[in-house]
Amino acid sequence: MCYCKVGADIEKFKKGFQETVSRGPDQSRVITITDGIIGFHRLAIMGLTPSGMQPFALNGSYVVCNGEIYGFAELKKDLKAKGYTFESDSDCEILLPLYREYGTDMFAMLDAEFACVIYDAEKRSFIAARDPIGIRPLYYGYDEDDAIVFASEAKNLVSICDRIMPFPPGHYYKDGQFVCYRDMTKVPSVVGSADDAAGASEVTGTFGSKVTGTFDGKVTGTRDEDLETICKNIHDKLVAGVEKRLVSDAKVGFLLSGGLDSSLVCAIAAKKSDKPIRTFAIGMETDAIDLKYAKQVADYIGSEHTEIYMTKEQVLSSLEDVIKMLGTFDITTIRASMGMYLLCKAIHEQTDVRVLLTGEISDELFGYKYTDFAPSPEAFQKESEKRIHELHMYDVLRADRCISVNSLEARVPFGDLDFVEYVMGIDPAKKVNVYGKGKYLLRHAFEEGDYLPYEILMREKAAFSDAVGHSMVDDLKEYAEGYYTDEEFKELSAKYTHAKPFTKESLLYREIFEKFYPGQGEMIVDFWMPNKEWEGCDVNDPSARVLSNYGDSGK
């Protein structure tokens, strides 16, 4: 957390800072500098000694970073050759030397999941940045004197800022401007020629600010690749994305739903590990769908597997805590968080695992059930771009909060920058479901190599909130239906103009959200829903269960 203001109120800062101590329970530090206050909660993952504690300092400048920098050893080697010395094994210690050498150009050099704030002592200014996907959280707002404040979560800022917004992924903040340094959806081989895509772009940012950036026109070249070449590259790049995320000084585990995405991550990791990996799954006591398939995968890959069961009572009693934790009112995000939160809570309480690999971001790249209804490859690509841009408000937010509130770290192999860039560059005509099976390219990429049972590799997609047990979503709906009368629903929902609640369930979530984040609804652009402009997708529930092509997904 960073309060960028001379004479900032230290007590007000500490009050907000303490809201997220669970993100880093190992050690906390607050320092006051000439131009503000910087605070850091540490969860030790790389470099477990006290020397890895932040903020890191260099010639009066400071940096705090929540992140993992992959391949940092090579960057560190180059910096040592330039004369820099290091006191810890932390990957984040390289950031200030990188900034000194390359300025804000450093952010485009990073293969990382990160959110950071740098204080430049020479210029007496603050620079903030966030990874291109938004896997690591970062929020900002302004106090009563228009001073900017940065923090990992919105709850840090509620007592300081009147309006809070998510920091845009792939941007850095400098001198009052948000500048795009990398947009993962700008792939000229899909959207047009390199000449069309190169050059400056400008969009309206949050708070009405102008966000500018450039694109170098690099062509990925995937338009001319045949299907087998594409699938080989998908295979190789995902394997690399998993492998680099296995590096940790803390114990690593895996969330396993038994669906395609998490199962692939686990299967790849099992092949790359010299001992059985540790996998974890959760489901309702009454009708868990995932547990059966997760056990099948665990047996196949030989993992050390743990099953957790949850009850209706646990779900309902956790609802308010989950919404406060998430900082959202979005229906599908909250539903899917119930099981994930309870699973991660059990992992924290019952094991020594501190890093979890998950299967998020595959859907945004390869398609949901509803994208089977895309009217054209171009529409599919446009929808994928939208989902990638908004990931930080939905699935990625869910994974981060459910995991970090339990003092664990999330790593997302499908969010590997090289992998995302490559898949976004594949001709969308090859990605749309013309094969009779969604996500065909991903499935076909791993048909050889004995990664998974064929039944799992070809299993129909089921949303996590459905697959932990249909009864969980039904229980939440039933609870909300009994919470309000029809008249109360009509009256209470009428007061909202942004993202207006349209069911009693959505109203219940919004009312709880407002209790902890009053007036901050615009942090979330809208409810996550299928594209209602497409035939077959004009539905009023985000669950794939309401789609006509759901088929065997829930079996």
Feature locations, PLM:
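N-terminal glutamine amidotransferase
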Residues: 1-64, 68, 97-202, 210-225, ...
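ATP-dependent adenylate-handling active sites, centered on carboxylate activation for C-N bond formation
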Residues: 5-12, 81, 101, 122-127, ...
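Conserved beta-strand termini and adjacent loop/short-helix elements that scaffold enzyme active sites
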Residues: 41, 89, 181, 282, ...
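Short active-site loop/helix that positions an aromatic residue
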Residues: 75-78
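Short, flexible active-site-proximal loops enriched in glycine and acidic residues
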Residues: 82-89
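Short, conserved phosphate-binding/catalytic loop or strand-edge motifs used
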Residues: 92-96
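Conserved S-adenosyl-L-methionine
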Residues: 453-462
